[in-house]
A protein has these predicted regions:
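Active-site cofactor/cluster-binding pocket
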Residues: 1-171, 241-246
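Structural motif
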Residues: 5-7, 29-32, 59-62, 80, ...
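Acidic, glycine-rich active-site loops and adjacent beta-strand->loop/helix elements
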Residues: 12-14, 37-39, 67-69, 107, ...
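Glycine-rich, charged/polar anion/phosphate-binding loops
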Residues: 15-18, 46-48, 68-69, 195-196, ...
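Active-site-flanking alpha-helical
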Residues: 87, 228, 497
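Ferredoxin-type iron-sulfur electron-transfer modules and their immediate structural context
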Residues: 99, 112-271, 278-485, 491-492
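A short alpha/beta connector and helix-capping loop motif
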Residues: 496-502
């Protein structure tokens, strides 16, 4: 079906992002939007292209506030029953009265074992869906509507911005067919820039957490469980706190044994609204509120990410609390709201991400982990982050082992190069000292990373025809100790990939 008689948009963020959903409605068809907006507010959220299509094609436009209806009835975020009822009231696939009765009969059969209260709750949702529809009068002026605000230009590394603007943004607006083959010229080898997910800002959550700084225990459990790295603690110096946006919330007392101001920054436009952070908070300092009322907190989150430095004395691997001050190198993925996989993977990147290789089996973790042009794996301010690759479903163990053996072989050659330089009479004392420090820390990831940086700096200072030096500098990314991981689900681990047979 390329053109339908009825299309419904169940998430208002799709309207705000400008998805071309209404273009799939036949002329004279019906378009239903689930939202909390009044007709006047709706007009502000529809872009010019959507308005023009509705007006020029005589689309019948309706809204329904299934979000508030479901919450009021007691169904929480489960709007599907309300929206199913609205569908039958508008789509005319069955006489609407018959459809409503069938829905109620099915609800009674399905939920009777859970009690009459649950049955009644669903019956109320069914009635509410058909009764809460609002017909929107389409102004004639929509046919010539024009967008007044120009889209904001992307900022960041040139290659990343080019990929975001030419591939990610059109695809994200359901306009993938407009992308020319030339846009993929930089990616013919299958590699894509890291960190693109930070540009999506999808705003898909209707409800997001808001933080009460007065009652917060600074335990960081919320950040520890957040699957999407959208709630993060930051330690601010006096200067950073003073320069923060005026609406930045700050804990009344500094972080223990420091002078740093504590803040918990939340990204409402990246949050998925799962509520896992709410459940884990021991002091109930987080509550769910409508996202639109929290959108001013996005500036606070963006400031903290861009301008607040990581403090080594509080950002350590030692505890749950300290680990969450470290930058996650997996953020804003497309995994399901509340996904536990991404919580684990995100934590691993906080501990090892700047020197991490990942071999990923095909499955959920490859879908949220490696979507083309929207990678959620990112890099730190020095440009280091996880190197990620996906082979097949059945050979992930071999693929990961190959990664490990390959990088080890290159590193062992470089280690011999370092030994050659360290034993050379021509090497300066500074170069020899850097070589010795490197060789003494080979199996310590953190210490070796620092020693590698110092060694490369010393070798870059000198000018000689030494083959060992040239080999090291040409392959310096392999010099430090790496952390190799194999990610996969139970289908790979216990079924297809179990015997290692391709």
């Amino acid at each position: 079906i390329n053109k339908a008689d009825f299309v419904a948009c169940h998430n208002p963020s799709y309207i705000m992002k400008g998805y071309k959903m209404v273009n799939d409605v036949k002329p004279g068809g019906k378009f239903l939007i689930n939202c909390q907006w009044t007709p006047e507010e709706l007009e502000k959220h529809l872009n010019a292209e959507t308005k023009q299509y509705i007006a020029k094609n005589n689309i019948q436009l309706y809204t329904v506030n299934a979000i508030d209806i479901a919450a009021k009835i007691g169904l929480g975020k489960r709007t599907s029953t309300v929206l199913q009822s609205a569908f039958f009231a508008l789509a005319n696939v069955l006489p609407s009265e018959d459809a409503i009765n069938y829905m109620k009969e099915k609800a009674t059969m399905k939920f009777s074992k859970k009690g009459q209260d649950i049955v009644d709750m669903n019956h109320k949702a069914i009635d509410a869906g058909k009764d809460a529809l609002v017909k929107i009068d389409v102004p004639a002026a929509w046919a010539t509507a024009v967008d007044t605000a120009a889209p904001e230009a992307s900022k960041g590394p040139a290659k990343l911005v080019k990929m975001v603007d030419e591939i990610m943004k059109p695809a994200g607006k359901m306009d993938g067919y407009s992308i020319p083959c030339s846009a993929f010229a930089d990616h013919v080898d299958g590699t894509f820039e890291q960190g693109a997910s930070a540009y999506e800002k999808r705003g898909v959550a209707v409800m997001v957490p808001t933080w009460n700084a007065e009652t917060c225990a600074k335990c960081n459990k919320c950040a520890f469980v957040c699957p999407h790295a959208t709630i993060r603690p930051f330690a601010l110096t006096a200067e950073e706190a003073a320069a923060a946006p005026a609406n930045t919330k700050k804990a009344p007392k500094p972080i223990v044994k420091t002078d740093y101001t504590y803040t918990l920054a939340i990204s409402p436009m990246d949050c998925m609204g799962c509520g896992v952070c709410i459940g884990v908070c021991p002091t109930k300092s987080l509550t769910m509120v409508p996202r639109e009322g929290e959108e001013d907190q996005q500036a606070v989150f963006d400031y903290c990410v861009a301008k607040v430095s990581e403090k080594p004395e509080v950002a350590t691997d030692a505890t749950v609390i300290s680990s969450q001050y470290k930058q996650p190198l997996l953020e804003f993925s497309g995994s399901c709201a509340g996904c536990a996989e991404t919580s684990y993977a995100r934590l691993i990147t906080q501990l090892f991400g700047d020197r991490m290789y990942i071999s990923n089996a095909t499955g959920c973790s490859s879908i949220w982990g490696g979507p083309a042009a929207t990678s959620p794996y990112t890099v730190n301010k020095e440009g280091f982050g996880p190197a990620w690759a996906n082979s097949l479903f059945e050979d992930n163990a071999e693929h990961g082992l190959g990664m490990y053996l390959g990088q080890r072989a290159i590193r062992e050659r470089l280690i011999n190069d370092v030994k050659t330089i360290a034993g050379s009479e021509k090497a300066s004392d500074a170069v020899k000292a850097a070589c010795e420090q490197y060789l003494n820390t080979l199996e310590d990831g953190k210490e070796n990373a620092a020693a590698t940086k110092a060694l490369v700096a010393e070798l870059e200072k000198i000018d000689c025809d030494c083959e060992a030096r040239a080999d090291i500098l040409a392959n310096k990314s392999y010099l430090s100790k790496k952390s190799v991981w194999i990610f996969g689900g139970d289908g790979w681990a216990y079924d297809i990939g179990f015997g290692g047979v391709d």
